[in-house]
Amino acid sequence: MPHSKHRDYTADKQDIPYTELKACKSPWKHRTPAVKQSPVVLSEEQLKYAELTFHRTPQLQPRKQTVRRKRQGPKSAVWRVVTCVLGVLCVVLMITMGILVPKLFSGQEEQYRETSLHHLLKNDSSCDPCSHDWIAFGNNFYLFFRGTKSWAESKSACEELNSHLLDIDSKAELENLLLFEINGWILVKKNQTNWSSSENETKLQHTLIDEKKNHSCRYLRGSQFIADDCSSKKPYACEFNKM
């Protein structure tokens, strides 16, 4: 029995430090809630991060604008190329119009002159030089055409106007016609002249140039009478002698 009591006593002694240890550990359990300050620290860090992001956000906007400008760059270059091409086309069209329009109007004017004279001759057998662009020197009237025809076609066209192909029969008439720089068929042929005086006839023969075998028709170029093929196309002038 004494031995058992001794064991119980020792057991009680061992229980005492265990309870003391529990009692000593208990204050740490009460101090553990102090560790809960970490969320406060995190919230301060979050505030700093928010402030940093708030200061950085305005700097991102220019980058977006530069990206937009870079994206718009190729489109503006394409539009520049298109405008340059359109400008070149407009210049080319203006040049072509400036060249073609005068030719068109001159051709229409000549056709109108021929048709008006043709209708006039149908209505009246006599030619009225005052109603058209005839040029008068004394009793002679001249009408010049820019359209090209052969010698025979020019002669028949003048006959339809109740006139004849240009016939230079005097030196004074030639000097008057030199003022207009005429370049076209005349009525005289090879070995044929209407000049009355022998002096004028020799002058006509000396002014003939480029004479060939098949060139039996004459045309006037400035003050020169040139022999050429009758089938070649040249301008012509009609003459009307008013009595």
Curated annotation (Swiss-Prot):
Tissues in which the protein is found: Expressed in natural killer (NK) cells.
Glycosylation site residues: N123, N191, N194, N200, N214
Domain C-type lectin: 137-239
Keyword Disulfide bond: yes
Membrane side Extracellular: residue ranges: 102-243
Motif (ITIM motif 2): 47-52
Compartments (UniProt record): Cell membrane
TM segment ranges: 81-101
Example GO biological process: stimulatory C-type lectin receptor signaling pathway
InterPro entries in the cross-refs: C-type_lectin-like, C-type_lectin-like/link_sf, CTDL_fold, NKG2/CD94_NK_receptors, NKR-like_CTLD
Keyword terms, alphabetized: Cell membrane, Disulfide bond, Glycoprotein, Lectin, Membrane, Receptor, Signal-anchor, Transmembrane, Transmembrane helix
Cytoplasmic topological segments: 1-80
Disulphide bridges: C158-C238, C217-C230
Gene Ontology cellular component list: external side of plasma membrane; plasma membrane
GO molecular function: carbohydrate binding; transmembrane signaling receptor activity
Membrane topology recorded in Swiss-Prot or TrEMBL: Single-pass type II membrane protein
Alphabetical list of Pfam families matching this protein: Lectin_C (PF00059)
Motif (ITIM motif 1): 16-21
UniProt remark on domains: Contains 2 copies of a cytoplasmic motif that is referred to as the immunoreceptor tyrosine-based inhibitor motif (ITIM). The phosphorylated ITIM motif can bind the SH2 domain of several SH2-containing phosphatases leading to down-regulation of cell activation.
Biological function: Lectin-like receptor for natural killer (NK) cells. Heterodimer formation with KLRE1 mediates inhibition of NK cell cytolytic activity.
Subunit note: Heterodimer with KLRE1. Interacts with PTPN6.
Protein name (record): Killer cell lectin-like receptor subfamily I member 1
Organism the protein comes from: Rattus norvegicus (Rat)
